[in-house]
Amino acid sequence: MEGEIVMTRGIDHIGMTVPSIEEATAFFQEAFGAEVSYDVQRPEQEPMAGDEVEKQLGLPEGTSIIHMRLLRIGDGPTLELFELGTEPDKEPLRISDIGIHHFAFYVDNIEQASERFEAAGGSLLSPPHSLDDEEDGPHNAGVYGKTPWGSLVELIKYPDGVDYPKGSEAPRWTPPKN
C-alpha cells in the first residue's frame, strides 16, 4: 500500500517452553499474580505436530506441542507457554548463550517480590543488589533468579529513573504503576 507507514506497536508476547504448563502456570500465578488468558492448544486436543507445524515454528522433526497457554502478568507483554510431547533439546539458555535468555519483571518492592518468587519455588542467584551506571539510583535494584525448571528471569525496579546518555534515541518502556 503506497504511502502507508507501518509502525511496530511493541512486544505482544514472549514464548517459553516449560516441562509442565500446569506447574508453570501455578508458579507464575503465585510468584507474579499471573492470570490465564486462554489455551491455544489444549491437552485433550490432538497434538500439534507434522511437517507443516515443524516448518511454521522451526521445530525439529518429530517434535509435538501438546499444550499452549497465554498468561497475562500485570501491564506488559503476554507470556505464551509451550509444553512439548517430546523431550526438549537442551537446558534453558544462559546469558552466555546466543538468543533470548531472560526477561525481567518490573516490581515495586524487590524484597517482597523476591520472597514471593522463592516461596513459589524459584531460586535467586544472589540477594537483590543496586544497579550500575545509567540505572544507578538510591532505590533502584535488581536480582536474577531461576524458575523451578531453570529459566532465567530478573526482578528489577528503578523508581529513581534512568540517567539517559547524550544521544539516547528513546526512553526505555516501564510498566505504568497500577
Please name every model-derived segment.
Residues 2-6, 16, 39, 79, ...:
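Vicinal oxygen chelate
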Residues 8, 70-72, 146:
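Short, low-complexity cationic-aromatic patches
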Residues 9-13, 98-102, 140:
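Short, solvent-exposed beta-strand edge segments and adjacent coil->beta transition regions
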Residues 17-75, 112-113, 119, 136, ...:
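Core segments of cupin and vicinal oxygen chelate
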Residues 44, 86, 159-162:
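A short acidic/small-residue loop/turn micro-motif
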Residues 54-55, 64-65, 84-89, 99:
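Short acidic (Asp/Glu) patches
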Residues 71, 81-83:
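Helix-adjacent hinge/juxtasegments
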